[in-house]
Amino acid sequence: MMLMSLLLVLSLERLITKTPNWHIEKYAAQYRAFLQDKGLIKFQEGNEDEEGSKKVSSTALYFYLLLPAVVLGAIEYWVLGAFLTFIEQSIILFICIGCPALRAVYKSFLNAADRGDLQACSMYTDQLGHCASQTDSDGSAGTEGKTFGQHLTWLNYQHYAAVMLWFIAFGAPGAQFYSLSRSTTEALCDANHPLKAAAGRLMFALDYIPVRVTAFGMLMMGHFSRALPEWIKYALQFDVPAYDVLTQISSKAEILTPDEQQLQAENAAIEPKVLVKLAKRNVIFLLVITSALTLVGSLA
């Protein structure tokens, strides 16, 4: 059932242009607004026991991020049958996976790079909006392409590979929990909210295994001998951000040829295109592994 849902959703995601009603960001924003209106999540400021208040707020954040997934899992277990669960899981996965805005920014970046408009390339890189990893640029075509390619690799992981892995491991509740946590972390980071550090710690934990599985897929689909030492280096490190793990390994897994490096100096789109191809091959790798696990009976 999981494999069928993945194949169905990935096919539809490629064929259909999603409206906001079919993307997690809309519902995550509504959920956060509901919690805010009810006063269920807020940073409790005060001179007395400030650390205790912060801890309570962090615990509340984790609880309310997990709550919808628990409710969804209970509904699947006690209410829905096998067929309805398949329909429900496919719908939830379709809502959680992908990012129409990311795809639009990518196309705009390619057009700007083809025109040689580096200022527009820099603007589109900023529009990718990964709050926790802002990278400086010297304005050259090579640097703009590298910066955009790194952000694109990370966001592609967050919106595709990570969602797939959480879905494979825990079904629709897992995909929903990860997507809601990712969206909330970005919102708190953009707003410079006091809880952004707590949300960041949660995402570090949620990404720790999936990002290494994804990076392993990239080295399998790319230059294995070059990327393997880098993967081993980061495999058990607990102090390296997931963003750095993925971008460092992907840069080793897919190295530009001399001709591509020469073109990259003039056209910022070369490296992002190469990394997107690597990400697509990685998705296929994850599907193949899922198929194998399904055949041996490890997945339902």
Region locations from a protein language model:
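Hydrophobic N-terminal alpha-helices or hydrophobic patches in metabolic proteins across all domains
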Residues: M1-A300
